[in-house]
Amino acid sequence: MADSKFYLGRLVDAKTAKPTTNPVLYDPADLTTHAVVTGMTGSGKTGLCVALLEEAALQGVPAIIIDPKGDLTNLLLHFPDLLPQDFQPWIDPEMARRAGKTLEAAADEASSAWGSGLTEWGIGTERLLALKNA
């Protein structure tokens, strides 16, 4: 994957609905000074914006973010070591209790789920650390 292009994910096979190994890359030279992302509820607008902003940060591209709903505040949360104790402050104690789990167990599950998901998409620790330091 070329470092000069934004990595937005991987192509999805239309027949199986599963990700392929083919990356979706975007040339930041095609960006203008403003962007608008529109779409139906649940169509991936926030996910696309997060990906674009993270990739911009990794390449030192500045951004001003207007986020009236607060969807993008989690951009500042980076846990490159994927340690359960890093996730624990963000676990809802009441939800954990209702699920019959301790906070520690819920944090361990969250850490494990994030680790598996990132690995599945080919995102390693070095990339997470670079984003944290961007």
Which residue ranges define each predicted feature?
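Basic- and hydrophobic-enriched, low-structure N-terminal and domain-boundary segments
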Residues: 1-43, 47-131
